[in-house]
């Protein structure tokens, strides 16, 4: 399915800043789709131009090259995920029940990204990692930032007494995030993403708070 809008007739000079941003986002939207379908190395500017029904020259007024477009696409994805991850106050919960509800809210919002836009998973977990060391480092830094943010929730639970005193918060936070991102990858690849989301949502919650031992 092609992006419906096109950029035909763009003026060369005197564009309003809001129009420049709008057109950049159009290019990024189309580029994300093409990169996720063909991969970075198999994609060229002509493929993205074809998706938008524009000439090659238009691109070079907004982006220097394919690499810059790719980095911008990944940057936008990281912003979207970051907005969800930072959408709750780590210190707001005062009991285990409140924390479980908070985790479920965050999980629902985060997993919804992968349901609504499976290209996010493709870009983050495949194309970015496979590009080069510089891009892998950017994604690695993102993972580290999310890990530190997740740790704040665990520190709050220890401080207020509803999580174990001996909990290794840093390692546990990274383990939780690994599970969450693997869930997102699986959701995005599923033929029934809504069903897969529910399965992984319940699995993550149960594993975090009840473990795998038989309940007495």
Task: Describe the residue ranges of each PLM region.
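Hydrophobic alpha-helical connector segments
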Residues: 72, 87-116, 173-176, 198
């Amino acid at each position: 399915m092609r992006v419906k809008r096109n950029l035909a007739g763009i003026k060369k000079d005197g564009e309003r800043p809001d129009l420049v941003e709008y057109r950049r986002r159009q290019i990024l939207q189309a580029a994300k789709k093409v990169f996720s379908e063909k991969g970075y190395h198999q994609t060229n500017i002509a493929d993205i131009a074809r998706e938008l029904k524009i000439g090659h020259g238009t691109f070079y007024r907004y982006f220097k090259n394919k690499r810059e477009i790719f980095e911008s696409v990944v940057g936008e994805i990281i912003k979207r995920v970051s907005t969800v991850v930072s959408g709750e106050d780590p210190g707001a919960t005062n009991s285990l029940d409140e924390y479980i509800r908070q985790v479920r809210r965050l999980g629902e919002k985060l997993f919804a990204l992968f349901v609504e836009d499976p290209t996010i998973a493709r870009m983050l977990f495949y194309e970015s990692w496979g590009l080069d060391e510089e891009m892998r480092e950017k994604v690695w830094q993102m993972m580290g930032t999310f890990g530190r943010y997740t740790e704040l929730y665990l520190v709050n639970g220890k401080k207020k007494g509803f999580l174990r005193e001996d909990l290794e918060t840093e390692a546990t936070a990274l383990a939780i995030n690994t599970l969450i991102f693997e869930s997102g990858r699986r959701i995005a690849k599923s033929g029934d993403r809504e069903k897969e989301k529910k399965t992984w949502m319940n699995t993550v919650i149960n594993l975090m708070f009840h473990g795998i031992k038989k309940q007495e």
